[in-house]
Amino acid sequence: RYCPSGCRKKPYGGGCSC
């Protein structure tokens, strides 16, 4: 999956960090 603009994807697959 992709994260919203301005957010980063967590390396552990925990979702997105905004």
Curated annotation (Swiss-Prot):
GO terms for cellular component: extracellular region. The modification Cysteine amide is found at residue 18. Expressed by the venom gland. It comes from the Eukaryota. Keywords: Amidation, Disulfide bond, Secreted, Toxin. Signal peptide: none annotated. It is found in: Secreted. Transmembrane segments: none annotated. Disulfide bonds join 3-16, 7-18. One of its GO terms (molecular function) is toxin activity. Belongs to the poneritoxin-Ae1 family. This is U1-poneritoxin-Ae1b. It comes from Anochetus emarginatus.
